[in-house]
């Protein structure tokens, strides 16, 4: 995997920096593990915009990824690594000894031909999935479940990882990359190692059109709008917002806490790091 700066053959190409991985499969995805994906353009069933700056983009098929890793005790061979347009991480196609194939998030250091396994008796090896009760304290892990059997929810994007800090009774303590320390049940599964494609955040898109290919629409500044459209809008000529930065609906956008899920507050041992005061 390497960062490549392309030749400046046009203004749009001048700033492009791409991540090139020569080991990725160049053909089509495994046909039995893809399904149709309909675009919503950020709208709900009433046609109202619920997520701004989404729309258009190239058609994509969804790759069905195994986030549960519940095929225990059966060895799987890494058949190939593939690009996935739906996420920042790459995928690994596993071929189990009984012939079944599944996609998983590709961990760092995985190459075709390696043997992986899941289950409580799986060896402590990069890419293997085990319950947290069977993983040594201090290990770096990814694809962590938050509820047993629900499937991985934490540390799934490119370069992401979590550290297992401690185990106390039925719960393990995890340190997330944000600095938050969170409690998770020891029966939840996680995969050893960190997610691959860690250079994804170093790429440079280069031009606005490349963002449109990805289904990302422009973001208009509030101060460039009218007062009816945004709290920062209006004024004669170029003017400042005249207040602390807020969202279009008036919620402070700099350092204001918006978490409202009090039901799981007890699972957070320490909140994420903050530079605010």
From Swiss-Prot:
Alphabetical list of PROSITE patterns matching this protein: RIBOSOMAL_L2
Domain of life (superkingdom): Bacteria
Region (Disordered): 225-277
UniProt keyword annotations, A-Z: Ribonucleoprotein, Ribosomal protein, RNA-binding, rRNA-binding
Ribonucleoprotein in keyword set: yes
Pfam short name (any one): Ribosomal_L2
Gene Ontology biological process terms in this record: cytoplasmic translation
Any one GO molecular-function label of the UniProt entry: rRNA binding
GO cellular component, as recorded: large ribosomal subunit
Database matches in SUPFAM superfamilies: Nucleic acid-binding proteins, Translation proteins SH3-like domain
SMART domains linked to this entry: Ribosomal_L2 (SM01383), Ribosomal_L2_C (SM01382)
Annotated InterPro entries: NA-bd_OB-fold, Rib_uL2_dom2, Ribosomal_uL2, Ribosomal_uL2_bac/org-type, Ribosomal_uL2_C, Ribosomal_uL2_CS, Ribosomal_uL2_dom3, Ribosomal_uL2_RNA-bd_dom
PANTHER family assigned: LARGE RIBOSOMAL SUBUNIT PROTEIN UL2M, RIBOSOMAL PROTEIN L2
Purpose of the protein: One of the primary rRNA binding proteins. Required for association of the 30S and 50S subunits to form the 70S ribosome, for tRNA binding and peptide bond formation. It has been suggested to have peptidyltransferase activity; this is somewhat controversial. Makes several contacts with the 16S rRNA in the 70S ribosome.
Entry similarity comment: Belongs to the universal ribosomal protein uL2 family.
Subunit structure: Part of the 50S ribosomal subunit. Forms a bridge to the 30S subunit in the 70S ribosome.
Name the record gives this protein: Large ribosomal subunit protein uL2
Gene that specifies this protein: rplB
């Amino acid at each position: 995997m390497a960062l490549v700066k392309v030749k400046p053959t046009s203004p749009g190409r001048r700033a492009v920096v791409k991540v090139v991985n020569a080991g990725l499969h160049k053909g089509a995805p495994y046909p039995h593990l893809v399904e149709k994906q309909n675009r919503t353009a950020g709208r709900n069933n009433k046609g109202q915009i619920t997520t701004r700056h989404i729309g258009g983009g190239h058609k994509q098929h969804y790759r069905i990824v195994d986030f549960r890793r519940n095929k225990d005790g059966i060895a799987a061979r890494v058949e190939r690594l593939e690009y996935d347009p739906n996420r920042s991480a790459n995928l690994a196609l596993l071929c189990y000894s009984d012939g079944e194939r599944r996609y998983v998030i590709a961990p760092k250091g995985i190459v075709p031909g390696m043997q992986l396994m899941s289950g409580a008796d799986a060896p402590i090896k990069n890419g293997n999935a085990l319950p947290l009760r069977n993983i040594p304290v201090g290990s770096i892990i990814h694809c962590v479940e938050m509820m047993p059997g629900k499937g991985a929810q934490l540390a799934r994007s490119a370069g992401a990882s979590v550290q297992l800090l401690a185990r106390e009774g039925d719960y393990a303590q995890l340190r997330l990359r944000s600095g938050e320390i969170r409690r998770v049940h020891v029966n939840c599964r996680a995969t050893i190692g960190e997610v691959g494609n860690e250079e994804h955040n170093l790429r440079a898109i280069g031009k606005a059109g490349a963002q449109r290919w990805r289904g990302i629409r422009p973001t208009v500044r509030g101060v460039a709008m009218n007062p009816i459209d945004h709290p920062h809008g209006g004024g004669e000529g170029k003017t400042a917002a005249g207040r602390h930065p807020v969202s279009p609906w008036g919620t402070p956008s700099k350092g204001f806490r918006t978490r409202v899920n009090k039901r799981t507050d007890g699972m957070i041992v320490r909140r994420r790091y903050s530079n605010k005061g």
